[in-house]
Amino acid sequence: MTGYEAAKAKYAALGVDTDQAIEILKKVPVSLHCWQLDDVIGFDNDGGLTGGIQTTGNYMGRAKTPEQLMADMEEAMKLMPGTAKLNLHASYAIFEPGEFADRDALEPKHFKKWVEFAKKHNMGIDFNPTFFSHEKVKDGLTLSSPDEETRKFWINHGKACIRISEYFAKETGMPCVMNIWTGDGFKDVPADRMGPRLRYKDSIEQILSEPYDKNLVKPCVESKVFGIGVESYTVGSAEFTLSFAALHDGCMPLMDNGHYHPLEYVSDKIPAMLCFYPEFALHITRGVRWDSDHVLILDDETKEMAKEIVRNHALDRVYMALDYFDASINRVSALATGFRSWQKALLMALCTPNEMLKELQDTNQMSKLMVMNEAVKMLPIGEIWACLLYTSDAADEAR
């Protein structure tokens, strides 16, 4: 009997079909963020990173051209079991020599090479307007700016991204999740909290007034509790984005598990959201004391988030994307490690006897529930993971 066969039998004794778990996982798309490979710099300007976010470290090998970034992504993908989508920011537009378009004038043609890359690897594409790292971010504000010229520029950028998102979906044959996030906010206590949010609301409504096929483009709005330089007030708060998505047909909320107070757990928010939203999006990261965007590892909260998605039969309702960036280590390794960590978490959730555990809770057998939860932790998940890697032609960590 092989190691996998022995492990499979142990899981089967608890009613878990590991073969089925592996096949399900292979088909679950997870969006792979290109910005880990170049420290969120992009190709459309030479300025520094803004928007209340930052990368730390100076490890050699940062991708500096589209060709280098694509090559690094291909290298990382060789190490990944399962299905990946490509996640792009608008700042990764690729221009021909002598060509340039500002963000309010971006067109599908500026992303043609990314479409070719995605088709080569049978990937869908998700997209993000880039509301940071640009000279027209005025006083730290974009879509909520009181300066109408500034606000109009960024509204037009959002509309351009709607058109580009639809182009991606039509070309790849897969829906494009388009995420709206800004770092708009104030460093110190504001005199007016409502005004910026009313402008922000109007701006997003104008962006979403751009015609698009709702089956192809999946807009979402992302919240954040604070950022560097915007510690006192963030325009796009959790209450704002949840309310906006609830009241605007076709718009989803997006939760980033690094964008909340450290004692808030997105794993607890996921089932609450599933009670009310037919679908929503998730950015998966690892915050260390704040939204530090450390590389994802198989820690407790990562496992709990995966459990809540799987045990509530929501793999087809939650759009999952990675979002972290670490410049202190090998970037290809960082991208692959985070992807594999999320795959491990999903596999563990798929190999958990969820119905049995739920029955124990519903019948108030809490002592047995604790015992079984602890027993599940000791099951030979490593053998199931090794089988997934082998059947996906992906390297084992030991290699």
Regions found by a protein language model. Name each.
Residues 262-288, 322-324:
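A short alpha/beta connector and helix-capping loop motif
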Residues 24-36, 51-90:
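Catalytic domains of carbohydrate-active enzymes, especially glycoside hydrolases
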Residues 35-37, 91-93, 130-132, 183-185, ...:
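Active-site beta-loop-alpha junctions enriched in small/polar residues
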Residues 390-399:
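Single conserved hydrophobic/aromatic residue that forms the stacking wall/gate
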Residues 29-40, 77-93, 98, 104-135:
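Glycine-rich, aromatic-flanked loop segments that form ligand/cofactor-binding clefts
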Residues 28-34, 84-88, 123-129, 178-180, ...:
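Hydrophobic faces of well-ordered beta-strands that scaffold small-molecule active sites
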Residues 263-272, 292-302, 330-340:
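Histidine/acidic-residue-rich catalytic or RNA/ligand-binding cores of hydrolases
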Residues 107-132, 136-248, 252:
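Active-site acidic/histidine proton-transfer and metal-coordination neighborhood
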